Structures are given as structure tokens and as C-alpha cells.
Amino acid sequence: MEKRVVIAVILSIVVLYAFSYMFPPPVANQKEKAGPVAAVQSQPSSAKLSAIDSVPAAATPQAGLAARNIVVDTDLFIAVFSTKGGGLQSFQLKHYKDKAGAVGRDIVLKNESDGDKLSLLSEGKSFGLEPSLVFQSSAKDTKLAGTEKSSIEFTVTSQTGVILKKVYSFSGNGYGINLHQELINTGSSRVEGAISLINYNRLVAETGDGRYEVYGPVTMAGDKVITDKVSDIAKGPKQFDNNVSWSAFADKYFMDAVIAVKNSIASARVAKISDNYVQTNVTSSPLSLNPGQSASMDYRLFYGPKDLDILKAQGSRLEEAIDFGWFSALAKPLLRSIKFFYSYTHNYGLAIIIITIILKVLFFPLTHKSYKSMKEMQKLQPKMVELKEKFKNDRDAMNRAVMDLYKTHKVNPMGGCLPMLVQIPVFFALYKALMFSIELRHAPFVLWITDLSAKDPYYVTPIIMGVTMFIQQKMTPTNMDPIQAKMMLALPVVFTFMFLNFPAGLVLYWLINNILTIAQQAYINKSLPA
């Protein structure tokens, strides 16, 4: 879809404006792969080593125990943890539905019945810690509201006498979860190794709502965000060893992430292990524990929407998981502006209209200058035709004569194009903001448009948009040959078909922009001398 938008914009801007510059009205009596990050020396580990006053008695590994679930219910989500591996079995978002309207059910980011494919499983083979170990926990189901906080603790002891404690901490009104892991060596000899958190993401097919247009691992390593498609890692695992800040798996609207706290992630590895699963391992720096010593490390976990403000609140530049492309610096303030106007209108469609009007007003001086320059060029067209005829056998002489003509009449031949080029980055930034905004997902506008992130179900707005393009085209008469005239006549039809399946929010922007352009062009044509 993005390629079609790029083509649409280029055609619209170049054809609608350049043609009026290149073919003025007749004068009277005048014939878009990231590769794996290179391995470099990792940052120092944040694991805190300390000696303990009394060594806890080593317990027998709990591999034979039956696993049980612990439910954490907050204002925003319902998470189900298992004592098997101390991992996450399911995660359900309360405020986001899979479908618009009353038929929608809560979005489920995780739901694994296979105990071997839970997320946040801990593994440290050198310490005798296997993901299949069943932890002990006295925690009970927990319900939190508002600013209430709580935690659940899991504990297991390996055959080597290493105790692993996992403590998850929650808040009733936040998506972020803190994970504290502590290793205690209760054995009689030193142990060395690293500990990993293992995540499994079940692969799903495209659902038709555009959610999986963007789908795959996202990693921030070496101060860069690397986005991989599932097809990329199907060719081979990706290893990241350079200052890993976070490792995530995301679709267009939602994501889960493990975020390093004080360099707690030394490396990350992403691999497609089967047709159904992608496995991500985030691993600590090497640890060395003498008898009686302990080490701890912390992580920030996130399971939730790709909302710009929510992600930014998590820290570690997690908001950069939203790919706004080259125009990120413009897209973010535009998106925040849309959200600002929504806070007053309570309708994202109206917010888009307001932003479109504001942009049109801001760019009016440039547009006015552009049309004025085109008018001046049109006045010189008869003399240019004479020069081309006079110097038709000497191109260099003709070019010099044309430039002298421009200089004499103080006309800039690029004056009609440059003001339009300035607006292109703003359009692409707004396109990105609308295209990847979770705020528009299932957001109604008026009447039949109940989801601005989906196509217009009755194709009304794309058709009206095509009509406005036709009117706009007719308001810019050009001196074209029959072939060019047919191309211009077909352009609104082509655009209409291209926009039939575009998100209604994006079509709404283009439609309002066309209507404002028609009004603006009528005013300019009336105000400028013929």
C-alpha cells in the first residue's frame, strides 16, 4: 500500500502542478535490509553481585510439581502467569478490541496452552536452570485498580544449588511491568554463565484489517532501531551484541518488549524456529558466583498498544518502534496535534479536518507564490515560442535567449515548483501519522464510517475525492496534445481506484485537501490579473 501512496503523491503533485507550468493555456493568436548488527564488545553488565549473610538452604528442583496459574487483573489488562518457568501464559488488553462495534472482543496478545512456548521463561544452563522447571510461589490471583501496586514472586532451586527468584511488579493503571531476577549460589563451588529470558511469538495470518501489514521483530541495538520482517529471519537467525536497549515483537498496532535496565541485556537473538513461532532470547553478560554470592538484574516489560505517548513513557526510546520513516520529526508533532484536537472534538475525523485546514492556511503564501509564478510564465509563453522557432537549430543559443528572457522579466522558472516541493515532506509525514496511528483504529467519524483505519465500506469518500480531482483539473486549463489530455482525464479515475482500499482517515484528508485546493485556486485565479 505504501508504494501506491508514493506513486499517488508523486503523480498528483508533479502532474497537477507541473503540467500547468509546462503546458500553459493557449495565448490568443498564438499557435524503500537491515542486516545483523556486527558483534562488538558488550556494555558492562548491570548485574549486582553481593555476598549474603546466610545462605538459604538448597531445595530440591521442582520439575515434578504440577504447574498452576496466577492471574493479575488491572484496569488495562489481564495477565496469566504460570509457575512453569515463571513465565507468561496469556495477556489480554481490556481497552482494545479485535473488531469495531459491539461484536469486538478484547485483543489477546498472548495465549499459549503449550507450556513449552510461554514467554519470559528463564534459562541458564550453566546454573542448572531449565525453562521447564516448575517454580514455587505463594502468590494468589491479584486485582488492581488505579494507582494500586502489587507483585508476584516465583522461586526455584536448580540441581547445582542455584536459587532463581523472579519478581514481577505491577501497577493498576500502567502497561509497564518491572521484572527483577536474582540468582543466589547456595552450592559449594563457583558457578559461571549467563541467564536468558526466552520469548515465543506465535505467527498469525493477515486478518484483513491491516494489523499485520507491519509484523516482526524490532530491536534497538547500537543506538539504532532495526526492524525485521518474519521473512527476513526465516533466512537465518539475527544476532545483536551491540548495546541492546530493548527487544520487541510488533505488528502495526501492538507490541511486546523486554527493555534493559542499566545494561541488563548484553545480547539478543531472534530466530524463526518453525512455521508457527519466532523465538527471541535476551541474554545477560557473563556472571560468576562464588558460594554465598548473589547477582541481580532488572528489566522493564511492555505489552500493549503502539501509542506514541504510552511508549514514550516507558523510556529507552521505545516510541521509536513506530516506524514513521524519514519524516519522523514531522510525523510525531502532527500526530500529537491530531490527538490535541481530538481532546476537544472527541472525533478523529474532525481532528483530521482541522489539521488539514491549518496546513492549508500555513502553506497558502507558498501556494499563492507558486500560482503567481506560473501565471508570469504563461505570459512569457508567446515569446518563448518565438525564441524556440528562431533558434530551433541551435539549442545552446536558444537556452541563452530563454534565460535572458527570464532575467529581463525577473521570472524564476522554478518559482512554480519549489513552493510545492516544500509541502511534500509534510504530506508524507501526515500520511505516516495517519497510516500507523493506533488512535484511528476503530475510531468512528460520521454515519457509515465507523473505522477511520479501514476502507470506506461503501466507497463514497474515494468517489467524491475523484470528482474533486476532476474539478481541480478542470480549473487548471492546459495546452496539451490529445494524448496528454487523455492522460489527464484518466488521472482522477486512476486515483479513485487506488484510494478505494485506503484507510478512510487518509482518504478524508486527501478529500478535504482537494476541496480546500479548489477554493484556494478559485480565489487565486480571481485575485491575480489575467
From Swiss-Prot:
Primary subcellular site in the record, as a coarse category: membrane
Single GO cellular component term: plasma membrane
GO terms classed as biological process: protein insertion into membrane; protein transport
Gene3D superfamilies in the cross-refs: 2.70.98.90
Membrane topology (UniProt): Multi-pass membrane protein
Keywords associated with the record: Cell inner membrane, Cell membrane, Chaperone, Membrane, Protein transport, Transmembrane, Transmembrane helix, Transport
NCBIfam families noted in UniProt: PRK01318.1-3, PRK01318.1-4, yidC_nterm, yidC_oxa1_cterm
Transmembrane segment boundaries: 5-25, 348-368, 418-438, 492-512
Family affiliation: Belongs to the OXA1/ALB3/YidC family. Type 1 subfamily.
Function: Required for the insertion and/or proper folding and/or complex formation of integral membrane proteins into the membrane. Involved in integration of membrane proteins that insert both dependently and independently of the Sec translocase complex, as well as at least some lipoproteins. Aids folding of multispanning membrane proteins.
GO terms of molecular function: membrane insertase activity
UniProt subcellular location: Cell inner membrane
Quaternary structure annotation from Swiss-Prot or TrEMBL: Interacts with the Sec translocase complex via SecD. Specifically interacts with transmembrane segments of nascent integral membrane proteins during membrane integration.
Protein name: Membrane protein insertase YidC
